[in-house]
């Protein structure tokens, strides 16, 4: 196996490879670009015009997706997986990965779309570098751009594997891409309705990629992910990489769609959620329930039918989103 197949090992050790460019027997070029960043380019005669960005480790303790990317990289380096797509593999926050922590000082996934310019520190610099790497990768014209940013969640979920689909004014969400996610084992998709500051929103809004944040189960340490079933996703990624993907069923049967009703913003240290600490993502909320309270008698009362909560986190910094209230959506308006 080529040494660059050990990108994860190099990243966790904080080392640069001795050789920054290597070729497989099949003529696939693997090129180390920066810490945790590897570009894979097929021979020109095999290139099918797809540019695939796969990122994981934006939160350093979300190890199942990191291990999945490691397996794909090693398969390419051994010559078992024969790409027809260009691929950029990114391990998002190496410093946090080495600590086994979500982040060191700042949540990197709140620092995109210009937010890093308003901040300082190593993680703001890393967000800037990730934007630069993605922009350079997606700079070639007339190619199909796809980005999956892979995560696991802090808490359990009533729907274990789901996706968040960014939004941009004037652009339709793609039925084909939703069908592709369903075939990859994703059970639900949240259709966003406003700009965002996460990595997938940057590549979707600024770089024209089809981009998604994928939540793939609960965060666990390295080597403890045997209960996380990523086999359908891995198979679909291998098919996209090799250009052997069967046409997905665009009827979207079995895929639950949701839209954002509103975000719960933490305004002060007085903020409290009226939810159990271990409440799961997609837990249902009764209409009229007082969901959260904050300073100056601020209250979030559930007004929507069929409402659910995702990403409840009262420990975020003041001014940030502490949770999202979502409601069922239909497939009308998909492109």
UniProtKB/Swiss-Prot annotation:
Zn(2+) binds at residues 59, 62, 151. Binds 1 zinc ion per subunit. GO terms for biological process: arginine catabolic process to glutamate; arginine catabolic process to succinate. The keyword Metal-binding applies. It is an enzyme of class 3 (hydrolase). CDD domains: M14_ASTE. Pathway: Amino-acid degradation; L-arginine degradation via AST pathway; L-glutamate and succinate from L-arginine: step 5/5. Transmembrane segments: none annotated. GO terms for molecular function: hydrolase activity, acting on ester bonds; succinylglutamate desuccinylase activity; zinc ion binding. It catalyses: N-succinyl-L-glutamate + H2O = L-glutamate + succinate. Its cofactor is Zn(2+). Keywords: Arginine metabolism, Hydrolase, Metal-binding, Zinc. Its EC number is 3.5.1.96. Gene3D superfamilies: Zn peptidases. The active site is at residue 215. Belongs to the AspA/AstE family. Succinylglutamate desuccinylase subfamily. PANTHER family: ASPARTOACYLASE, SUCCINYLGLUTAMATE DESUCCINYLASE. HAMAP family: Arg_catab_AstE (MF_00767). Transforms N(2)-succinylglutamate into succinate and glutamate. This is Succinylglutamate desuccinylase. It comes from Pseudomonas syringae pv. tomato (strain ATCC BAA-871 / DC3000).
